[in-house]
Amino acid sequence: MVHFQLPVAAPLCLLCALLLLPSATMIPGGLSPRSVSDPDVQKAAAFAVQEYNARSANAHYYKELRVVEAQSQVVAGEKYYLMMELVKTKCAKTAGKPKVYKEIQNCELPPKAQQEKLTCHFQVWSRPWLDKTELTKMSCN
């Protein structure tokens, strides 16, 4: 009788062992949490802010207050899913003279009571071997 239960017990034990694996185990192609201070996340965030400013019709630049949450996904490169807080600066945009990220981050802010903040969700797709980074999705409110 024990002989017939062994083939059933082995797969059951394997299933239980798999369920006990840490939830942070990376699933190929799945989303993985990333530290907001990770250098690759910071690089993607800087790119997102620069692209936001290039695409927005605002007369002033917005700069990064903080990265709230970051995830990444391996997809023919790496796609970063970022939730960020941006704030409107006193730096006005000048036609033909766009500022780079570091310049934008040095822009002064209005007094706290007058600050305009945005929460933005960005998707940044990085393919370093092609020297290519794209902002594939952006929504702010």
Curated annotation (Swiss-Prot):
SS bond list: C91-C107, C120-C140
Keyword terms, alphabetized: Disulfide bond, Protease inhibitor, Secreted, Signal, Thiol protease inhibitor
Further remarks about this protein from its record: Negative results: the recombinant protein does not inhibit calpain-1 (CAPN1), a C2 family cysteine protease and legumain (LGMN), a C13 family cysteine protease. Does not provoke cell death (PC3 prostate cancer cells).
Record's protein name: Cystatin
Site (Reactive site): G29
Function, in words: Inhibits various C1 cysteine proteases including cathepsin L, papain and cathepsin B. This protein has no toxic activity and its function in the venom is unknown. It may play a role as a housekeeping or regulatory protein.
Location in the cell: Secreted
Name of one Pfam family that matches: Cystatin
Family: Belongs to the cystatin family.
Chain ranges for the short sequence motif Secondary area of contact as given in the UniProt record: 73-77
SMART domains, alphabetized: CY
Gene Ontology CC: one annotated term: extracellular exosome
Signal peptide: 1-26
SUPFAM superfamilies, alphabetized: Cystatin/monellin
Main location: secreted
Native organism: Naja kaouthia (Monocled cobra)
